[in-house]
Structure formats: structure tokens, C-alpha cells
Amino acid sequence: MNTNSIKRQTYLSPLLFLCCVVIGVTQSKAQQAPTEKDMSAYLMVFHNDDTHSLHMALSHDGYTFTALNDGNSIIAGDTIADQKGIRDPHIYRGPEGAFYLAMTDLHIYAQQAGYRDAEWEREDYGWGNNRGLVLMKSPDLIHWKRANLRLDNQAPFFQDIGCAWAPETTFDEEAGKLMIYFTMRHHTDAAKLYYAYVNDDFDRLESTPQILFEYPDEKITALDADITKVGDKYRMFYVSHDGVAGIKQAVSDRANGGYTFDPRWYDPEPQACEAPNVWKRIGEEKWVLMYDCYGQSVHNFGFSETTDFVNFQNLGQFNQGIMKTTNFTSPKHGAVIHLTKAETDKLIEKWGL
């Protein structure tokens, strides 16, 4: 054996080891999500009935929100959805720091907009029938990768689904996987809540959808689930159609089931509301329950605040109390996450505020 070769190998090995360590540390840092102490702003995503597109708004204090792009859409629904429109956007920051957008592939005014000949995609499948979701993943909220997911293709049992609505994402710590959950009904039956695991690329399911929660009376629809882990409990707020549509809460020790029914109504609204979303105030032990007040003539978001998930203070609706908007009205089905200053600055640089 060539002794020069031996010396060269001996000399290079420590360098290779050091490179591997540096790369490993760099990857570890890149995959570590920022913590609450790093956060300085709030990002709200929502859709608009006029555009059926994704909109975003920012707030530095959690009380006053300003829409990006002067209130215009950030991502046009007709560029990403099979039905040429999206509804019910939800945003989630994964444990590795990436952002996950999940949306309903549905345009309820597609006929008027000239996207289809009939009012709905299929006859005899009821209001707002659809079969798909739009899933998007981004490292920075600017560059997005998209997948269109058809739920009726997941198993023979799902071929007759009447809707797939309001998808949301969370991380199941026990399974160590991303989990999406959504509203689904068969034909025109009462809707129930389902979940499935999704791959890291956020473009395909890794399990067949299973029941997450159904109302005790199976003839009553349960929809629009929103799961938040607080302490060691998973708190799921959802919509019940047990009378006037409103918000109820169910609690479990795990993400993917076991939720205990609570008959109490948690919203203070006299008219129908839907789309609950819970978000925490930065640096405080306070959580905001936000919901879409759709049963009134002018749609709006309503807000209630809690420290213990038992007692809730009614904060009123946008521009009727302490919660304000500056340049948009009638948002639909929203969700809120925290952002760092750097992430906020990048969004403002891209879209303007």
C-alpha cells in the first residue's frame, strides 16, 4: 500500500468528521422551529366569498389586523384548485418549522363565475359538494409546494362522499406524524369528523381516513374541528348543528380520538357561527377562540378569550369591540399563527402592508 495514501487518509478523516458534525448541527438548527419567545406578530389566513382565494393579514399586537397586498388575494383559488376556488384555509407551523396550508377545494359560486355549467359538481349530493383538498407546504411563507388530494380515491368506502371540508393539520406526538383532520359526509348524510396521517412532503396520505369524532346523535352534523394542545390535553372546538349552528368543545388525552362530548355551547352569538380557531396571545396565558359569524346579514369574525377553557370573555366581533381590521371586511373561515420578526418582515417586503 502506498504510504502517501495512508497519510492522506489519516489527514482527511478528522476533516471529514468535522464537516459531518458541522452539517449535522446546521441541519438540526434548520429543522428546529422557533419558540414563543421568538415570536413578535400574528398571521391570519382566511378566504373571501368574492374571490374564493387565500388572503393574509398581519397584527403586531393581536388586536388590530391589516391585510397584506392591500386586501387582495395572496394565492388565487383558480390557480390551485380543481373547482377553481378554495375555502376554509388553515395554517400550521410544524415541529420542524415548516408551514402547512390546508384548504377545501370548493367554489360555491363556480356556475356564476363560468367555471362549471351546473350549480354543484354533482347532482343529488347536496350543498357545497366536493371531493378534494388543497395541501401546500412552505419553508418561508413565500415559496409554496402544492398537492391536490382527492379523498374519494383513498378507499372504496369513500367513493360516494358528499363533501370534504375544512381540513386542518396538527402533529400527533404519540404517532410522531403529521395528522390532517377534516369534515366528511357520505352522500347527503350527516357530516362527521375524520383524520388521517400525511407524509412529510404533505402531498399524500399515509393512512386511510378514520373517524375522529361524531356527535352522540348520529343524525346531527359535526364539522369544522380545530385541535389545540394545552398542557397535556387536546382541546377540540367544533361546530354542531344541534339547533342553531354554534361552537362546542370536546377534550381528549390524545390527538386522534377519545374526545369527550360536552353539551355546552361556547360561543356567545345569537346567530349561527362556524369555523372555530384557537390561538394564544404571545407571552400571556390567554387564548382566543375565533369563529365565523355567518348567520348574520354581514359576515364577520367573533372572538372570545379564556385563561382556563371554562370561562370565556366575549370580545365582540371585528370593529365592534377591541378587535379591529384596518383594510378588509367580511373575512371567512380564518386561522391564526405566530410569526417571528424576520418572517413578518419578509411577508411585508413581498406583499406590502
Residue ranges, per PLM feature:
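Bacterial Sec-dependent N-terminal signal peptides
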Residues: 1-34
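Carbohydrate-active catalytic/glycan-binding domains of CAZyme proteins
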Residues: 31-353
